[in-house]
Amino acid sequence: MKRIRVLLLLATVLSAACAKDMEDNSAAMPDDAFLLSNDKIAVAIGQDGSLACLRNMNTGHDYAADGLLWRMYYDSPAEKEIQILGSDQTPDVSVDGNVITLKYHKLVSRGTELDMQVTLTVTLEEDKVRFGSALINNEPHTVIRELHYPLVHGAQLPKDHKLFTAEAGGQLFDNPAQVIGKISSSPYKKPEQFFRQKDVKYGAKVFMNCFGLFGENQGLYFGSHDQTFQDTWHGLRAYRNSASGKYDVLEFGFFKYPHCFAGETWECNANVIAPYSGTWHVASRIYRQWVNTWWDHRKTPDWVYGMKSWQRVIFKHQYGETLFSYDDLNGKVDQAGQSVGCNALFLFGWWAEGMDHGNPDYSPDESQGGDAALKEEIARYQANGNHLLLYYNGKLIDRESRFYRSGAGPRVCRHDNTGSEILERYKFTGQGTWLGEYDQRTFAVATMMDPEWNKVLMGLQDRAYNLGAHSVFFDQLGYIEKESTNWDTSREYPVPDVFGIQKRAQCLKLLRDRYADMAPDFALGAEGTVDALAQYCDYTHGYPANDGPERWINFFRYTFPELVFTDRGLRDDVDVPRHVNNTVLDGQRNDIEIFRCRDIISAAPVYQAYLAKVNEIKEKYADCLLYGRYDDCFGFSSSNPGLDARAFVGKERMAVVVANQSGEKTQPTRISVPGHKFVEASVTGNGKVSSNGTKVTLGKYDMAVLVFERTDVRIGTYNLRRAKLDRSSEDNNWEKRLPRLVESFLLENMDICGVQEVDTEQQESLPALLAQNGLEYDSYFFSPYADDGVGTKAHGILWKKDRFQAGEPHFFWVSDPPELRQVNDHGNGAIKSNFYRGGFCITLSDLKNSGAKYFVIVTHAPLSKEDHAQNAHVYSDIEKKYNPEHLPSFFIGDFNAKESDECSEFYRTYWTDSYLYFDNDPSMRFGPPGTFNAWKPDKIKGPDRRIDFVYFRGNKVKPLKYVCDDTLFGGLCASDHYPVYVDFDVSI
């Protein structure tokens, strides 16, 4: 019976796709395919276990080609890396609900039957497909090393699709087949007669565990949503086409490394694929929604946000050459920094042995007065408003160091698959050839989270703090290596540690948390910006350099706007404007590393002059460019796509950065920023901006920064959940979550905010606490449980003190007559009780927008569908009574109702639902549909949980964007509802 239902569903789905007159590139699907579908995605598995369909239901494009879904590799005593192909196996396939299951009760390789079992699941979720896997190995003397799953083999790509990888923060390749199909730098070291491969390993200079194929209006997202952060390769292969001989049979997927021995099992349910509609920002939001379930990034110290650039300078080099002395710190080094508006020094080679020498001894340089003299110079430097960042290497152990020779080095270092120490060599040279070719330094590599090594790192951190530095920095801890992992050689087969990212994350968290409360402004930095590691850093040093034609860090920057990280690679006067402009466009800080840290910026006069100009602009518009939020292309329009343009949003202003990075001749563009008025602009080179900020003209590598002041109004709603509730919850009691609520309010920066479930004490304490943090609101609260409206269980409204003047509020009850307090909500099936429900209205005059007036109703509406529907008219009656001038009208609150409920349908006859307003432009809806999270952010996101609404009414009211902000704080929600807000442009 189920089989018939699936086939009928298949026919229905495909007919619907064709009926929409959409793109339909798919070949005929096998009659026996197993199908799952919703309004966004269709996925089907053939009876033979192939991927028969992976369709975007909105566009009709099918990315699948009935190709291979998985492969596996195992080792035996006689041979390594023996391949098992899914296409050679016979699965039992079944469907149950939204899950297709493939069971392989035995496997065959080269005609030999193996006692190994594989179970694969394909689960259709709202906006993606999740691919799960479970392995059982009962084959004696074998180990399953590698699983490639899921695979989209023979991927069918639209012509406009480009390949995005997260290498070095992000690269975008116009021709996926061309870049993947290239032969490697060591031809045929791999079996390239069969396929070509682009090597991309998460964490190994790859910032995110996702990649994608992005078109203008649709794309295919691949994400390994794996909170173990185990080794994951992004499978990018081009197989040889037997018909043409070309390497154009594209395959995309994920590679995992189970190392599953005989008698063991292994599972993974982390890999997802999402055909999506819209721009690449949709894919970014999918990844960020997953990241929010584990993200634990503390509030970055303000001085770090305000850091425009740093000078990275080696004082004493590896081979003993002294480049600068402690005296120079407050002399020519600081003078060079000040000449370009740089007030931070990233200090290398400050110890006796010199840079990349003697780790982890870092002996005091007694020839200069030791640590006492260094501490004195640091204090002088920072007393002038500067910041010193003190360098250590987080993993390298010099084999000539006292630490290594004491016997500690061999105990804590990593070992390879033979049990030998893993070594690294650094080939810095003098002016001859001897050092680099013959006498380079040799380092062992420490094992992360070894207790003995942890003590070393903590001791170094303490030393930096005691020296008075504003930050401690650990080199090479913000990423993992491709190869130098630690091996366990005690088993039948040697096994590498595949949890390198996890252990470095634990190490960085340990270091961060040691000073988080005691000295919150003492910053922690690391080299590399892998997301799982960067969450524990206050800033990161960009690695590797990424400044070629494929550079495209837009995706990473948009996904992680809160991170502070630098560029890398500009070391002289070559190609300065283009490189520096990139850092402004992408919100990076400048890593000033003249001649690879051997000199200071006064030795590069072209760079010095240009950076001085750019840093002056950064300082002038610091509220946006340094402290603001990167918002990519949102909030404005630019008429010329040939010019790069980005938005940075501050509390009250927006900066639009426009640059001519193409190297082409002079180009004009027109800039429009709805809901804002132009204030001023600054340019580099011969750039020009019209007096009203609408026209920009830029020559080769010119840049303009235009600043606009907000005239829009941000109106939202936030159910705070009563303080008396959740007292027994370790994480969500009021005292624990209050700092999260404050941080959430600061992040949303709402001009007008309706709030619900506010008890008496919090009606005073919360606005006061927000004011202490720089967000000053006036407020009004109404309790429907008291005749005079004063008391607990209240809902209220907050408005910015310096922007609005309030009229007289009027409260009411959601019943007939509205002036009489009475029980008017008898609950629903889950909650049976007697509630008093009400609301209030108020008029606010906008002092910033020429005295424009807004009429606002705030409510916490009935749970009972019947009671709610019966009395829904009360709100519109109140609006008509108290808004005779027909002012722009906003109706906000926790409605305890879905959009499909009768009451919601009634409200839409009078007001417009701001969420539904963007049905024709869903790219301007941010965050999940669901607003009620029930403290379960990883599970509850769907539209049925949208119960908090922002309605509007008025011909001159235009919503600019809708946001349901599911940001977590230390992995936790601030309330059991997400805040919801809408930016409105209100014409007067």
List each language-model region with its residue ranges.
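Structured beta-strand-rich core segments of catalytic domains in phosphoester-bond hydrolases
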Residues: 752, 756-853, 964
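Acidic/histidine-rich helix-loop elements
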Residues: 715-738, 815-833, 862, 939
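Polysaccharide-binding surfaces and accessory modules of carbohydrate-active proteins
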Residues: 24-42, 59-108, 116-118, 124-237, ...
